[in-house]
Amino acid sequence: PYSYPGVVPFGGEKVEWNAQKVSQYLAQPVDWAKARGVPLNRLVAGEFGCMRRLAGCKSYLDHVLTALDANNLHWAFYSFREDSWDGMDYELGSEKVNWKYWEAIEANKPDTLKRQPTAEFEPIRKRLQP
């Protein structure tokens, strides 16, 4: 697996992804909209996220959201309390879930894991506050 920040194959070459690169990359649709007279409040960044157990997930989320917030863009992260995979359920932190979680999923029942504020969820949580 990859870690963030770090080098990742992208567009046929190896690219260093960090806060600056994320900001630069996410500026492209903003520049496109401005060049065409599309109001920025019409742009939505949807379904971004990272596997919560990978190194740098919290930083990645924070860097993406910081770049989006710089232009007051709408956003929707993936995935809030996903019911079939724990990988992007940031309220679970960075540890593995116990077997009871998977037993519930396999039985098509709600899992009983308690969600709570975690370091991984903080970049999102703080932006959801009034």
Feature map (PLM): residue ranges:
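Aromatic-rich peripheral "rim/lid" segments of glycoside hydrolase catalytic domains that contact
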Residues: 55-130
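Extracellular glycoside hydrolase catalytic/binding regions
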Residues: 1-71
